[in-house]
Amino acid sequence: MGAHHTATEQSARLFADACAVIPGGVNSPVRAFNAVGGTPRFITSANGYWLTDADDNRYVDLVCSWGPMILGHAHPAVVEAVQRVAADGLSFGAPTPSETELASEIISRVAPVERLRMVNSGTEATMSAIRLARGFTGRPKIVKFSGCYHGHSDALLADAGSGVATLGLPSSPGVTGAATADTIVLPYNDVDAVEEIFEQVGDQIAAVITEASPGNMGAVPPEPGFNAALRRITEEHGALLILDEVMTGFRVSRSGWYGLDPVDGDLFTFGKVMSGGLPAAAFGGRAEVMERLAPLGPVYQAGTLSGNPVAMAAGLATLRTADDAVYAALDKNADRLAGLLTDALTDAGVTHRVQRGGNMLSVFFTAEPVGDFATARASETWRFPPFFHALLDAGVYPPPSAFEAWFVSAALDDEAFDRIAAALPGAARAAAEASRPA
């Protein structure tokens, strides 16, 4: 247990091959390991909590495909559902019963959601929700928060977290001033800033969008009452509240963050868990708002593969398998991981905070509470790469960025935690011995 896994020859070869045909060798930037250095691991299979790479190294997975795999990988119920549906056809470009089934399942869990539209990614979900909010209110401006990531559509990439934070970019080349001219970015968890901007231009604001509990600047949960304050302010000014639950939805509880902090958004966005790891997402909300979408209303949104039957089957199987025992296991496993992290880093004398957003968590190398993007960026992020690589070499796979949340699955067992516990002291020492860049 805790043996080092340093062979990366096959992953290095595959990465070189990928770089010849794919920009940067990856299809999402964080996978390239730019934030931590080294060779990105090319995964060839996964089962339960185990990942296996091209060099036959095995890792305890603490990324879970960036959240969706709450049951663990290749869960039999999900695999069987996908195989059964795939045998009847992969895509039809026509309505299917499973779209209605999954929409009904989601609506039954999140009370403010009365209607739901399927899309193919979280980016599509938030982009479409913004368009709908503008179409419904007739107003142009959107308020978002620094460090909250809502996908890579132009209007929402301003001062985002996730990969943009990893790359150290304020936005992205190719995002024009015109695209973000109506995007107002405020500090997260700052109710006064929200009040002030609504006093100034409230009659122009279509919506406030926020991650229900952010995980893209690390796990930085809302201060108690923050989301409720957003609800109050938007209602007072006739704006909509969009709660982005792409990450938290059906992970932190069977009703997502709404189950922990029941604030009635006008619109919600979902992804990740809702499709069991296949590419699908959704946005939904009040019927009055959603029925402005085509074909009922004038706000256009469409997608050739939206509501794909295989993705719908994976989502239904995941949600229906995730019973109370699964959510209890997720919370218990997050508690256990947080305790091991705290003990190891404390024993090594490393100043740190382990922060939680439900069963999502992050390690910040700072003594200060992290309540916004500024404090997240002010932490000693240079300690993270050696911490990460020590864990990776010991067969534990954490997120390859200091600005991403860690995710547990219900599949984790004593063997998994024994490996994590064996790996952490060395990783904590590596963090303690890290040198601040010149």
Swiss-Prot record:
InterPro entries: 4pyrrol_synth_GluAld_NH2Trfase, Aminotrans_3, Aminotrans_3_PPA_site, PyrdxlP-dep_Trfase, PyrdxlP-dep_Trfase_major, PyrdxlP-dep_Trfase_small. One of its GO terms (molecular function) is transaminase activity. Keywords: Cytoplasm, Isomerase, Porphyrin biosynthesis, Pyridoxal phosphate. The modification N6-(pyridoxal phosphate)lysine is found at K272. It catalyses: (S)-4-amino-5-oxopentanoate = 5-aminolevulinate. Pfam families: Aminotran_3. Gene3D superfamilies: Aspartate Aminotransferase, domain 1, Type I PLP-dependent aspartate aminotransferase-like (Major domain). GO terms for biological process: protoporphyrinogen IX biosynthetic process. It comes from the Bacteria. GO terms for cellular component: cytoplasm. SUPFAM superfamilies: PLP-dependent transferases (SSF53383). Its EC number is 5.4.3.8. Its cofactor is pyridoxal 5'-phosphate. Pathway: Porphyrin-containing compound metabolism; protoporphyrin-IX biosynthesis; 5-aminolevulinate from L-glutamyl-tRNA(Glu): step 2/2. It is found in: Cytoplasm. Homodimer. Belongs to the class-III pyridoxal-phosphate-dependent aminotransferase family. HemL subfamily. NCBIfam families: hemL (TIGR00713), PRK00062.1 (NF000818). This is Glutamate-1-semialdehyde 2,1-aminomutase.
